[in-house]
């Protein structure tokens, strides 16, 4: 059996999809469906069972025998960088992850988990080393602290433990994320409502490492199949501007850059906004992973076709 926590969420459901494409359906999805809209991410996927995240962690803490577990992909977390309830974040992201990690270590179950580029804060170099890590929010701190915890235990681990620092992930199955969904998702919605797609002033200068969710799932699967351990950046290694994203969206809809409306940048975001991210992929490439990543033009075109499918 394969377990995917956050399996009804954005990245988790895409990992389930990738597993289905390998012919695997013996999958236990763990999630919190309080937001019932997330069920839509699982409708076209084949899984064996579903478990609520609180019931699942209770079983983990109790040391219950959950059967023969081949691997756990731990994608479940509060991923809102705007959430400032530190007690909630640390319990949900840090403590939960530690319990799951130790369950896996004790039973030598491979453990692959979601970290985040938020661990770097506003640094301008993005390498998986302590000197480049300075998170700006409690979400980033929860991910950073768990990475530090993993670093300390890795030398003693007898089974793979692997964390991925996701950069700006976009693509299918993020509809439930609301304000935290990608820029491409929001621009598409604006166009469908008959509005002009809106970008913040200066968006041509805000450059991020936008990575397509299908590529993210592919790296997770490959690292599992190749018994990779460590903490790795997962982006494309190439920063592109928000304007490039917008241009790819409007192109799909038969519009041009002239159709984009520029709006003022919100004051409250200025001190907490990463202007630039670009994953250094040296460490990931050193594992032997050599597949290319989709560019914004390629990935957004594929995503728009999926979002606007009839």
UniProtKB/Swiss-Prot annotation:
Q: Give the positions the UniProt entry annotates as the active site.
A: 139 (proton acceptor), 177 (proton acceptor)
Q: Which domain of life is it from?
A: Bacteria
Which reaction is recorded as catalysed by this protein?
ADP-D-glycero-beta-D-manno-heptose = ADP-L-glycero-beta-D-manno-heptose
SUPFAM superfamilies hit by this protein:
NAD(P)-binding Rossmann-fold domains
Question: What protein family does this chain belong to?
Answer: Belongs to the NAD(P)-dependent epimerase/dehydratase family. HldD subfamily.
NCBIfam families reported for this sequence:
heptose_epim, PRK11150.1
Q: What is this protein called?
A: ADP-L-glycero-D-manno-heptose-6-epimerase
Q: Which organism is it from?
A: Pasteurella multocida (strain Pm70)
